[in-house]
Amino acid sequence: MTPLPPPSPSAGPRAQWLDWSGLRLLIIENERIRLVLWPDHGADLLEFRDLASGLDVLWKNPQVWPPRAHALDQPHAGRSEFYDTFHGGWFVSLPNGFFPADYFGAPLGCHGELQSVSWTAETTEQSAAAVRVVLTGRGVRTPWQLTRELVLHANEPVVRWREHLLNRSPNRLPVAWLHHPAFGGPLIEGAELVTGARTLITPPADRPELAQLQPSYRGAWPLAPEQATGVLRDCSRVPPAGSSLEHVVHLTDFPVGWGAVWNQARGLGFGLRWDESFFPYAWSWAAGRGHDTYPIWGTCHTVTLQPSTSPLLPFDRLVATNQVRWVEGGASLETQMAAGFITQRTAILDLAARPAAPTSST
C-alpha cells in the first residue's frame, strides 16, 4: 500500500498544501498531531496521526488506495459507484444518510453527494497559537451547502470544528446527517470501543443471511444476541484482525455525546465529542476482515463510531417516521465537534474551543 509522505517537524500550528499521487491535499498540523484532508473529494480526512507514537488512526481500504476521485467506467449496481471511491478515512454523509435515495427527484448515491463534491479551502488564521481553516462544499443535485471551520491550537492533540449547513432553496427540506470516521491500523488491535451510550439497537437486516446479530434488537450497551446462537456478543470489543466477526449497531441514549477507541496495551486512544442533542445516535460498524467477496474481499479490519442525526434506515423511512432534521428555506443548522488522541480510557474531550489570540492571516 502506497503510504502518505512522513510528517516533517513542525514548529507550531500550520496549514500547507501537498501534491501526492495525483491528489491535491491539505495538511493541518502542530507539534502533536497531523491531519491530511482531500478538499477535492468531500474534504475527506485521509490521515489523523499522533506524532509521538507515529500511529495514524484512520483505516485505509487497500482496494481503493491511493484514493481515487471517480467511479470506474464499468456497469454500476448495488452501490458500486460509492465503493469505487471508498478509500476509508473520515467523510460526511449528507443529505440522505447512508442509503441511496430519491431526494425529491434528485438521484443520490450511498452516503449522499457532499462526500463526493469538491470543496473550497482557505486558511483564515495561522500563528504560534493556532491554525484555522475553513472548508465549504456545495451540493450539485441538492441545495445544501456545508461549511466546516477546523481549529488546531498549539501543543494540543485535539482538533475542534464547527459545521454550518445551509439550505439554499426556498423550500423546507429534511436532512439525515452523519459523520463517518473509520478507524484502523495498530491502534485498534486489541482495542475496545468506550462510550457513554446506554442503549444499543441493531438495524433491520436488508440481507438477513449476512447479519451476525439478531436484527431489530434493542438492549443495554454493549451486549447484543448473535442471530445463530443467541449468545450475547460484547460489541465494545474490536474484532481481531482476520477474524470473521462483524456487526453493525447504533447507539443512543447518550448523557454526553462522546466515545473513544481505547487501546489499553498502548495506553492510548482516540476520542470523539459531539452535541448529543444534535446527534442523538452513533452508528458503529466493526469487522475483523469484512465480507470475503465484493466490495471488501476480506481485507477490512476496522471499527467506526459515527455520530448521526438519525438511525440506520432508508431515507424515505426516516422522513416518513420524522427521524430527520427539517430546515426551513434559507435557514441553517450548526453544530460543533472535537476529535483527538487521549491517554485516559474515559477522557472526555472539551467540546468548546478556546478563542485564539489575534494573529495575522496567511
Name each model feature, range by range.
Residues 2-160, 171-174, 178-362:
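Surface-exposed acidic/polar loop and edge beta-strand patches at domain peripheries
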